[in-house]
Amino acid sequence: MSRTISEDEAIEAAWSVQLPSLRLNMPLSSSNEFKLLRDVRGDKAYTDMGVWLRLCSLATSYKGHALPLDYEQLAQWLFGNVGKSTIAAEHVNALIAAGLAFLGADGSLYLPAVETEFVRYGKMIVGGTRGGRPRGKKKRRH
């Protein structure tokens, strides 16, 4: 008899934990979101994808795995320079338009790739606290 783990339980468990890894569907250039980004932005899409990867990396260690939508702060994190907030805004807005990021009701920047891993990792944490062994092949004893 097993009890399933809800997404709310998973989110609560992984809220302030750094995600150890992030699974991405590769190659990125074959995703529908990237194709849309490429159609709209041309060669700038490759820079946008670099920004997206950096934002994903930042979000994996940020509490709640969502970033504040503060372009000055994002520019500092992305470029190491506070004066580039308009460039950060341009990239982030392009990612939002392509569906690679979205704004939450709380005004934070969420990344769907991170959200998926956040819930998956939270379920692993909850499952681990319940004890037991994961189901797998039973080994034969000789």
What are these regions (language model features)?
Residues 116-142:
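Basic DNA-binding region of bZIP-type proteins
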